[in-house]
Amino acid sequence: MTKTAVITGASSGLGLEFVKLFANDGYNLVVIARNEKKLLELKKEFSNISITVIPKDLSMPNASKEIMDEIQTKKISVDVLVNNAGFGLLGSFENLDIEQQLNMIHLNISSLTELTYHLLPELKKSKHGKILNVASTAAFQPGPNMAVYYATKAYVLSFSEALAEELKEDNITVTTLCPGATKTNFSSVAKVENTKMFSNAMSSDVVAQQGYHALMQGKGVVITGGFNKVGALAAKFLPRRTAAKVAKLVMKEN
């Protein structure tokens, strides 16, 4: 029986790369993003599989519940959930627009949590459910000048690791992908493309492949790239104040 994967933020960047990987393995897809035109183009491009298009802004209240309602109405069984949608903002906390920061919290945390909650019953039915939550190396230390973003990714990592333990008996694996700087439209939205951190950004297809393979193997946490692995490890042993200073330095423009 053909399996189905639900992918958020599917119209570009890592989400688009995940669409390609799942499609190439013959998965049917439920693709979610704000840009309906791009989603419909994906449906046309991958005509060999069934793709359900759900144009939805996950930063809006009730979006996750509406997605679940549509999935149930169409009687779609779900085997894999990829929580990829998210964004960041560069700047001091007090100078960034508070509404944008609250939207970030809602998208990066609340929507991810809510969609996972609503889809868990479906994942349990599959007997071999898989969840991939996209966090970041930002999850491992505080991030001055991206304070809220770093905090949201720390939540994603902690939540995912706890959920992985809870769901072991249900044969559901939870994989947390923690990429460092990656070449996607995230950098332009967050306005970090000219920072030291993004001077050696990885390509989105390589990052997605590593995340996909880890997901299929049922791994827990995967950090992409050797440099990022070293940085995440160092952050665990550095005093928190020192780690924050280092994070602040890499946020400076070249």
Task: Spell out what each predicted region is.
Residues 11-12:
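Conserved glycine-rich cofactor-binding loop
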Residues 92-93, 97-105:
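Substrate-binding pocket helix/loop in short-chain dehydrogenase/reductase
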Residues 25-41:
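Conserved glycine-rich Rossmann-like NAD(P)H-binding loop of the short-chain dehydrogenase/reductase
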